[in-house]
Amino acid sequence: MKRSKADIVREYGPFPGADNVGGVSYDGRHVWFAGGDKLNAFDPASGKALRSIDVPAHAGTAFDGEHLFQLADERIQKIDPQTGRVLATIPAPAGGGSGLAWAEGTLWVGQHRARKIHQIDPQTGAVLRTIESNRFVTGVTWSDGELWHGTWEDDASELRRIDPRTGEVLESLEMPPGVVVSGLESDGGDQFFCGGGNSGKVRAVRRPRRGSAASSGAASPGEPARK
């Protein structure tokens, strides 16, 4: 496994009225984060808060190219980001969620204390497969064929790239002591957005560069898990 120190390139926030960040997503223009009783959006170029949606937002947040998905207790809500209207609700895997990501037609749901990541059907909530971790899972993102998740245990947090078929840890970016990860998203390019829990901040972390050969060997989220 490759280990390195996380390169934090920018910090955003804290934002007015948002004391906690529990999930992060990116829609190509705005960063969205779960702030408890609201979904909040800000401009990653200026850092300026833009708008909020009144909806329970306690944990993971995801974007499928058109709609937002938000974890709230034991359910996942599909939201129109233009109107804020909840379009559909599906059950979340039992045990509480702590991360959410969209990947080529399915959702990945992280579970904090259960130390699991579930791939689920976004129409029904049915669990398609489960990956186990040896650390608390505090954020999930999928980008360029890579599955990453955040961890936060005691005073230590890291970003992990894992094999989506086996759960094997392939790479780790260690955050500085005391800097937590609560929510994780890729911008589709060279950085991650990491929620900062009760610091109320979102941090941009440089994503390791990789050649096309490495990317071409990545697994598809639809491939069956190995037992």
Regions found by a protein language model. Name each.
Residues D43-G47, D80-G84, D121-G125, D163-G167, ...:
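Short loop/turn segments that connect beta-strands within beta-propeller blades
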Residues M1-G17:
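A short helix->beta-strand "capping" segment at the edge of beta-propeller domains
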Residues Y26-G28, F63-G65, W102-E104, W142-D144, ...:
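Residue-level detector of Asp-centered blade-edge/turn motifs that repeat once per structural unit
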Residues W32-D37, L68-E74, V109-A114, H149-D154, ...:
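Conserved beta-strand positions in repeat-built beta-propeller and related beta-rich domains
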Residues Y12-D37, A59:
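Beta-strand-rich domains and repeat architectures in extracellular enzymes and scaffolds
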Residues V181-K227:
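Blade-level signature of beta-propeller repeat domains, shared across WD40, Kelch, NHL, RCC1
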Residues Y12-G17, S52-P56, T89-P93, T130-N134, ...:
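Surface loop/turn motifs at the tips and blade-to-blade linkers of beta-strand repeat domains
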